[in-house]
Curated annotation (Swiss-Prot):
Known function: May modulate processing of the amyloid-beta precursor protein (APP) and hence formation of APP-beta. May enhance the activity of HIF1A in macrophages by inhibiting the activity of HIF1AN.
Stretches assigned to the PID domain: 212-376
Region (Disordered) location: 1-53, 124-168
Any GO BP annotation: chemical synaptic transmission
A GO term, aspect molecular function: enzyme binding
Protein name, as recorded: Amyloid-beta A4 precursor protein-binding family A member 3
Gene name of the record: Apba3
Residues where N-acetylmethionine is found: 1
């Protein structure tokens, strides 16, 4: 390396301030960036005293060679060196700089750490930065408006800066990995494992199919509206379904207008879609479906709608609801009704699993309805308020003034039933007896299991007493029996002749439901059959899977209708 000859200095000093700065060596605002700096260990007081001999030049060259190679050039086209920015070299004059020198003893450790991080992230000098790519954004740009704005490529105004914080002191970069919170509805594997599994619900459709939704073809006949309470008894529901069908369905012999539709059933909703365009004609949430009745090929779908708030106290207590009854015709009416019932069961099982409820704790047993069928007599017998002791005061030798009939074969409590009361007699005067009451004992003597003749003889024996105590169970004269069948092909288990039940099959669905021999059928599914032909009664009994029958003893019916004269005891 050649050494340059010693420079010849002018006799006078240059016009510059060479006073040694008390702080860090920072370029002055009045001098350009190419001003020479004293690099020796001790700078001379004046420029005339600085003599560069050969040894000083060699020391200067060694110090230059010791500097990093990447500081030798400027970056006119790209971003400046962060080290130059930190030391104030290589840029235009800055107004405010750090009070502590970066390489001095009192320099902050944070600044040094940030500088090292910036040096590690510098791009190679040979590869110019791509303007299309977003360059790192400097948090402390130079404040000189006249400086070269080329280094600010890739920056954006302060108002558009990202709100995400960066650990770097000098650079703000986008995070490589974004931590996202799990969705609200997600659950961990441990949580799902602790929930009871959804049991398989029997039905005509697969469980996954119903969760996605299944379609059934049908013919839409029409709709009507009914007013109803929120939870009427099943017999009332069946009567409402029969009334809706009678309103919509055309009489026999007349043309029935109908439209081809598809019934969409899922665990969330029940929709009626147009068969050609698949447009939703009706859409009901599953929880609003109140009742489904399949009456032969006719399907009645009943959806509940809450009415506006009533002002009167009577309407407020009743809480009436509007029932939207849709009537369809389909050969698969029974299958559609079963599918809707299966959707209810699956939705209930999902609700239990999501809330981590054990089905055994809420009595969710598949055969609960079969093991405990509805029986009108059983409801009255289980109510302790219906069991009474009635004391009748009368003259000795006077009869009680009651007419008794048998309860019927197959009754849960075989005993005598009060069929009529003598007007003005002792039984009517006491005011505690009514038609339909079961007499279980008289003066402490049980009548349960005795024949009708034995019960009548026991009542005649107390004529000589002035006070008679009867043990009764209060029951209405008309009782309700509910028969459940898995399908309409299963036999009912009883025979009917002229509206009177004449025989009963032991262990059949009719016996479990409360049907009794010797009773007269009054209503079937809410429809009166008193004056109905025998063939029509048989049709009503055989066209549905669930039958609600109201009956009363045939002898009581004949007495109340005047067909027979009562014999008072």
């Amino acid at each position: 390396m050649e050494f340059l000859p010693e420079p010849q200095h002018p006799p006078g000093p240059p016009t510059m301030d060479l006073e040694e700065p008390k702080g860090p060596e920072v370029p002055s605002e009045d001098h350009p960036s190419n001003t020479q700096w004293a690099l020796g260990p001790r700078g001379p007081d004046t420029l005339s005293e600085m003599e560069l001999d050969t040894s000083s030049v060699r020391a200067l060259v060694q110090q230059l060679e010791a500097l990093p190679s990447d500081l030798g050039g400027q970056f006119p086209d790209g971003a400046p060196c962060p080290l130059h920015i930190a030391t104030g070299q290589g840029l235009a004059t800055q107004e405010n700089l750090d009070a502590g020198g970066l390489l001095s003893a009192e320099a902050g450790g944070d600044n040094l750490l940030g500088l090292l991080r910036c040096e590690a992230s510098l791009p190679a000098q040979s590869v110019p930065p791509d303007p299309a790519q977003a360059a790192p954004r400097l948090l402390q740009p130079p404040e000189d408006p006249g400086g070269d704005p080329g280094w600010m490529e890739g920056t954006e105004p302060a108002d558009n800066r990202s709100s995400s914080s960066s650990p770097e002191l000098w650079l703000e970069t986008a995070p490589l990995v974004t931590h996202r919170d799990p969705p609200v509805g997600t659950q961990s594997q441990e949580t799902l494992a602790s929930c009871p599994a959804v049991s398989e619900v029997p039905g005509p459709c697969g469980q996954e199919e119903l969760m996605d939704g299944v379609l059934f073809g049908a013919k839409y006949l029409g709709s009507t509206q009914l007013l109803s309470e929120r939870n009427p008894p099943p017999s009332t529901r069946m009567g409402q379904a029969q009334e809706a069908m009678d309103r919509v369905k055309a009489p026999e012999g007349e043309t029935q207008p109908m439209t081809e539709v598809d019934i969409f059933i899922s665990t969330k909703r029940v929709k009626v879609l147009a068969a050609d365009s698949q447009d939703a004609l009706m859409d009901h949430a599953l929880q609003t479906i109140s009742y489904i009745a399949d009456i032969g090929p006719v399907l009645v779908l009943m959806a509940r709608r809450r009415l506006a708030k009533r002002t009167t106290s009577q309407d407020r207590q009743r809480q009436l609801y509007k029932m939207l009854c849709h009537v369809f015709h389909s050969e698969d009416a029974q299958l559609i009704a079963q599918a809707i019932g299966q959707a209810f069961s699956i939705a209930y099982s999902q609700f239990l699993q999501e809330n981590r409820i054990d089905p055994s704790q809420v009595g969710m047993q598949p055969s609960a309805s079969a093991s405990h069928p509805h029986n009108g007599d059983l409801d009255h017998f289980c109510n302790s308020q219906n069991c009474r002791e009635v004391c009748i005061q009368k003259r000795p030798g006077e009869g009680l003034g009651v007419a008794l009939v048998e309860s019927g074969w197959g009754s849960l409590l075989p005993t005598a039933v009060i069929a009529n009361l003598l007007h003005g007699g002792p039984a009517e005067r006491c005011g505690a007896l009514s038609i339909g009451d079961r007499v279980t004992a008289i003066n402490g003597t049980s009548l349960v299991g005795l024949s009708l003749a034995a019960c009548q003889a026991a009542v005649r024996e107390v004529r000589r007493h002035s006070s008679v105590t009867l043990s009764i169970i209060h029951c209405p004269p008309v009782t309700t029996a509910v028969i459940h069948r898995p399908h309409v092909r299963e036999q009912l288990g009883f025979c009917v002749e002229n509206g009177i039940i004449c025989s009963l099959l032991r262990g059949s669905a009719a016996e479990r439901g409360g049907v009794r021999v010797g009773h007269r059928i009054i209503e079937v599914n809410g429809q009166s059959v008193v004056a109905m032909p025998h063939a029509r009664i048989i049709q009503l009994l055989t066209e549905t899977r669930e039958i609600h029958i109201k009956t009363m003893p045939a002898a009581t019916y004949r007495l109340l209708t005047g067909q027979e004269q009562p014999v008072y005891l």
